[in-house]
Amino acid sequence: MNNFSETQIQDIKFLDELLDQVIILDKSKNICCANKSAHKRFGSQLEGKSISSVLRDAKLLDSIETSINQKKTQIVDVEVKKPNFQFYKASIIPGPSKLCNQEQSVIIFLKDLTEVFKTQKFKSDFVANVSHELRTPLQSIKLGLETINQGHATNDFESQKKFLPILLQQTSRMETLVSDLLSLSKIELEEHIRPTDKLDLKEIILHVVEIHKQIIKKNDISVDIKGEESKYIILGHRDRLIEVFTNLIDNAIKYSPKGKKIYISLVNNNESTTVSIRDEGIGIPKKYISRITERFFRVDPAKSKEVGGTGLGLAIVKHIVNQHRAEIDIKSEEGKGTEFILTFPNS
């Protein structure tokens, strides 16, 4: 700050208190001053650098020129792609100013709206996905009803009977989707509330396995449960933990060929309890593992719809795990199977 007067230093100190990033350019569009927030975001050595080397955004650079030429404040959206996506609302104010008295200088105020942008995009994508997921069964139901009402099946009871299972299947698919959406919405609203009930994880898992007894037998799958202790006590929400293990065991069954095994193990590590659910199924390609807990993400959409998946099950699992302050790790290899490892803090 050796080149600034006492008044200018006080102005800089004031700007340092702002959460927004403030960058001041001289007439050559080089940075002559930046506040602490800007240094923290874009680097400690900003002074002397060209603005184009710090923020590579064509709209911003064009707006700086416009602000200088028209001597008017310009407001523009700025997107930074690397190293991480950032979204700013930039206000570009033409100089001169107290901190740079050159005629063609400008002050840039950057308001970080990255999280707002992500939330809006998330909502937009979510609505689009829900619309798409509902449209397919609705079209099937509409087509079936039109055929019964106006087509060749109008007076043909046998033909009508053929359409009824299809209508019931698609109605059930919609019902499951809506149920999962409501469940996910409720979990997200309450995710910050940590459960306080003392529960035995092993008892919950045995309960879920018992519920799946018939489908396990039908698919000729065996379940191997190992646990060194009789009880594994954590603080949890019983119904939601049942939902977690229902989703994971259900997936293990659906994506495993007949005659295979599902391995479930529980280990108490003093401060935490680890549950592993491993199958010998089709596995997940490595490039998709990090995405499978995203809403509506499917590795194989055709297979998922064939087995009745909504694409929301693992998203529900992730949010319930978060609510329990637990961690989830996923390991998988194509053709060999998938393992979900959940680590819960002990009560």
Regions found by a protein language model. Name each.
Residues 284-296:
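Short conserved segment of the HATPase_c
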Residues 215-225:
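Short conserved segments within the C-terminal catalytic ATPase subdomain
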Residues 169-174:
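Short alpha-helical segment of the dimerization/phosphotransfer core of two-component systems
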Residues 50-115:
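PAS-family sensory/regulatory modules and their coupling/dimerization elements
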Residues 325-326:
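Conserved glycine-rich
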Residues 189-194, 233-236:
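Conserved micro-motifs of the catalytic ATP-binding
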Residues 2-38:
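Sensory modules in modular signal-transduction proteins
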